[in-house]
Curated annotation (Swiss-Prot):
Location (main, coarse): cytoplasm
GO cellular component: eukaryotic 43S preinitiation complex; eukaryotic 48S preinitiation complex; eukaryotic translation initiation factor 3 complex, eIF3e; eukaryotic translation initiation factor 3 complex, eIF3m; nuclear periphery
Keywords from the named record: Cytoplasm, Initiation factor, Protein biosynthesis, Repeat, WD repeat
InterPro entries: eIF3i, WD40/YVTN_repeat-like_dom_sf, WD40_repeat_CS, WD40_repeat_dom_sf, WD40_rpt
GO molecular function: RNA binding; translation initiation factor activity
One BP term from GO: formation of cytoplasmic translation initiation complex
Pfam family, one: EIF3I
Keyword flag Protein biosynthesis: yes
Xref: PANTHER family: EUKARYOTIC TRANSLATION INITIATION FACTOR 3 SUBUNIT I (PTHR19877:SF1)
Listed name of the protein: Eukaryotic translation initiation factor 3 subunit I
SUPFAM superfamilies: WD40 repeat-like
Role noted for this protein: Component of the eukaryotic translation initiation factor 3 (eIF-3) complex, which is involved in protein synthesis of a specialized repertoire of mRNAs and, together with other initiation factors, stimulates binding of mRNA and methionyl-tRNAi to the 40S ribosome. The eIF-3 complex specifically targets and initiates translation of a subset of mRNAs involved in cell proliferation.
Length: 347
């Protein structure tokens, strides 16, 4: 496996994200800089500067034209990928903790923090994609959900943008029917009817499969779970010994990659091996751990897999991004024998 070490942040990583082709990698951290990298060699393409606090989240559209970011300065910003120009800024009363483009990239959702008397909320904005008027975006959201119960910390659009899936601080996963032609606003009082208690602690990450029909979650309760996007049925559970911060689904091989480790405040009192700072590979179907890959000097905060499945990137508390390219043996190996390994066209 060929690792590439990327050093472009002064503080711990919060999220890494590949574009659709996988040739670009975007990283954000607890500093105000957004970095763009060439994934094949680790060369830095450029930076996006304008935020005034921790950048919690980032997402790029399917054409690698527009970038959206959320920060602790209570802003969500829209950027032009090619030039680094900030096209528009949305202002909120609290920090923007998670942003995500819809499947057709015509909408963006943002999850805002619950703080200072303000409830946590989820807002959906329609994006004006005309290059001539990029700087003219709607300030008002097309939909607002204010959470009456435990706040949402992560969210994503489900298949065909029919649903929005949210992960909450108490371990619940919820779905909301989304129709941008008939927007709904107000306080959500029906959380119990469209949610399931998937975890016993806060959900730290939620990532969709390639077709968005199921997704994987990671939690501080030391488990990662594979969940159906429509029914919220827990399909598989992957249990570890340490809190998990991120999980991602491999698009071509039957693996789920998870990362986490002992809390950052305790890392100086233990060795790297005891802290469980490795990236872990779990078989998606058999729920068995297949491999571990060390490298970071602290907890792993975020994981993203190349859309073609040929590499993955991880960002840690140590401030580094590691891009690991898989060897041919990874794709040729049959861990459970040829009869139990799915062919690519069957997955």
């Amino acid at each position: 496996m060929r690792p590439i070490l990327l050093s472009g942040h002064e503080r711990s990583l919060t999220q890494v994200k590949f574009n659709r082709e996988g040739d670009l990698l975007f990283s954000v951290a607890k500093d105000p800089i957004i970095n763009a990298w060439f994934s094949h060699n680790g060369e830095r393409l450029g930076t996006y500067e304008g935020h005034n606090g921790t950048v919690w989240t980032v997402d790029v559209d399917s054409t690698s034209t527009l970038l959206v970011s959320g920060s602790a300065d209570n802003q969500m910003r829209l950027w032009e990928v090619a030039t680094g120009k900030c096209l528009f800024t949305w202002e909120f009363t609290t920090a923007a903790k998670r942003v995500a483009f819809s499947e057709d990239c015509s909408q963006v959702l943002v999850v805002t923090e619950q703080r200072m008397g303000f409830r946590g909320s989820l807002r959906v904005f329609r994006i004006n994609r005309d290059p001539a008027t990029w700087t003219q975006q709607d300030v008002e959201p097309t939909r607002t959900i204010t959470f009456s119960g435990p706040k949402a910390v992560v969210a994503a659009f489900a298949p065909c943008d029919q649903y929005i899936v949210t992960g909450h601080e108490d371990g619940k996963v919820a779905i909301y029917y989304h129709d941008d032609k008939e927007p709904e606003s107000g306080i959500d009082a029906e959380l119990e009817e469209n949610s399931t208690k998937a975890h016993t602690d806060v959900i730290s990450d939620l990532q969709m499969s390639a077709d968005r029909t199921y997704f994987v979650t990671s939690s501080r309760d030391k488990t990662s779970k594979l969940i159906d996007s429509k029914t919220l049925q827990v399909i598989k559970t992957y249990a570890t010994e340490t809190p998990l911060n991120s999980a991602s689904i491999h698009p071509t091989k039957p693996f789920v990659i998870v990362g986490g480790g002992q809390d950052a405040m305790n890392v100086t009192t233990t060795s790297a091996r005891q802290g469980r700072f490795e990236t872990r590979f779990w078989h998606k179907v058999f729920e068995e751990e297949c491999a571990r890959l060390p490298g970071h000097f602290g907890p792993i905060n975020t994981i993203a897999i190349h859309p073609a499945g040929i590499a993955y990137a991880s960002g840690g508390e140590d401030g580094y991004v590691r891009v690991n390219w898989f060897d041919p043996g990874f794709f040729n190996s049959k861990l459970y024998g040829a009869d139990l390994e799915l062919a690519l066209e069957d997955q």
